[in-house]
Structures are given as structure tokens and as C-alpha cells.
Amino acid sequence: MAIVKCKPTSAGRRHVVKVVNAELHKGKPYAPLLDTKSKTGGRNNLGRITTRHIGGGHKQHYRLIDFKRNKFDIPAVVERLEYDPNRSANIALVLYKDGERRYILAPKGLSVGDMIQAGASAPIKVGNALPMRNIPVGTTVHNVELKPGKGGQIARSAGAYVQIIAREGNYVTLRLRSGEMRKVLAECIATIGEVGNSEHMLRVLGKAGANRWRGIRPTVRGTAMNPVDHPHGGGEGRNFGKHPVTPWGVQTKGKKTRHNKRTDKYIVRRRGK
């Protein structure tokens, strides 16, 4: 893994910083684990915009990732590491002893030729997936389930991880990167180690077009709009003279957005405290 700063041969290259990984596979992805991915332009079935700033971008195939890690007690070998345009993390193609291939998130330190395994009897080793009741307290894990059998939902992006800090009864307590501490059923499966490609945060796109390649359209400030388009719009000068709100008038910048009170009992400590 190397950080490469491009030479300023043009305005669009001047500030570009790339993350180069020589271990990544340079050929095509494994076709049986690909699925079609249609562009929506951020529109729903009525043609109305439901998500702003989406449109265009390069065509992509979706890689079918094994987030459940439910092929228990069958060892697998890492065939290759690959780039995935759908996520910040890299992925690994693994070949199981019974001949099946699957994609998994590539954890930090996993290399081609390494052996991995899932199941309660798997050793504590990077890339192995176990129920958290079998993982020692203090271990760093990723791709953590919130419900047994549903598949990993926590810590899936590049460089992400959570730490198991306690085990009590049927629950384990996790410390998330945000500082939040929450309880999860000990039967839930997690993968040992942290997600790889942590240098992803250091990349600099360098020009607007690089975001357009990714299907991301420009974000216009509310103060630059007319009053008909945004509550911050219009007026003389740049001061909109009110509390900041979304285009639909909902308070922003600090307003609480969590509404799922049913699971509040599992959160031991809120993030940022």
C-alpha cells in the first residue's frame, strides 16, 4: 500500500493523492459473484428525486459479498484481493475446500494464500469469523452482526473496527469508533481484525470530475438559491438570518435524528461523550 501524490501536470492533477495497492488483482472480477446494478439518478418509481446529488457515473457491477460468514468449519484460502467500486474497503475472493468461492471484506493484514475459517471452533486469527461469545474481551473485530444470522452491519467500511470490552450473560458490550458503547447478543458473528485499506481517508480526488465519475453531483448551498428553492435563499448579501435548516425546513446542525426508541436500552453510552 502506497500513497502517491501526482505531479502538477495540469490543474486537475495538481492536488490528486492516490492510494496504490500492488496486491490488488488487475483482471476482471469473478463473474458468478456479480450482479447488475441499475442507475436511478436518485429518483423513485414516480420519477421524483428522493436522494439529491446523485446522477451519472461509471457503469458498475455489484459484487455479492458474504456478510453472513455462515459457511462454518470449512477452511478457505484467499485466492486474490480485489478493488470494489461499491465500497471504500477492498474485498477478497476466497476458495473453500468444497470448491465454492465467495467474496468477503478484506481485513488489514490478510494476504493471498492465507487460510481463513468461520465457526465457533475457529482460532482467533485475522479474517476468521466467530460468535462473539467465543472471542476474548479486548479483541478488535469488524463486520459485526446486530441480529444473529442477519449478516454483519457494523464496521464494514475501510479502516473500521469495534472493540469487545465486556461480556455479561447473553450480551457483549462493544465500543464503536464514534465512542458509542452498545450491547449486542453474544451469539452474533463478528470477524477478527479491522477492515483494510485504512489509507482510503487520505486520498484526494483533485477535481470535480472525479466525483462525477463516482455518480456524485454538485451540492449547491442554500444561500446561493432563490427563496422559492430553499429557506436560506434570497436576500441581499450572504447572511440568511435564521437558524440553519434543510431545504424542507427541518432544523439541522445538531438536531437529534434518532427515532428508534425500541433499541435505546441496548446503548450503554452515546457517541461523543
Curated annotation (Swiss-Prot):
One of its GO biological process terms is:
cytoplasmic translation
Task: Cite the Pfam families for this sequence.
Answer: Ribosomal_L2, Ribosomal_L2_C
Q: Does the keyword tRNA-binding apply?
A: no
Which keywords does the record carry?
A: Ribonucleoprotein, Ribosomal protein, RNA-binding, rRNA-binding
Task: Tell me which GO cellular component terms the UniProt record holds.
Answer: large ribosomal subunit
Region (Disordered) residue ranges read: 221-262
Provide the GO MF annotations for this entry: rRNA binding; structural constituent of ribosome; transferase activity
Q: Which family does it belong to?
A: Belongs to the universal ribosomal protein uL2 family.
Name used for this protein in its record: Large ribosomal subunit protein uL2
State the organism named in the record. Answer: Haemophilus ducreyi (strain 35000HP / ATCC 700724)
Its lineage opens with:
Bacteria, Pseudomonadati, Pseudomonadota, Gammaproteobacteria, Pasteurellales
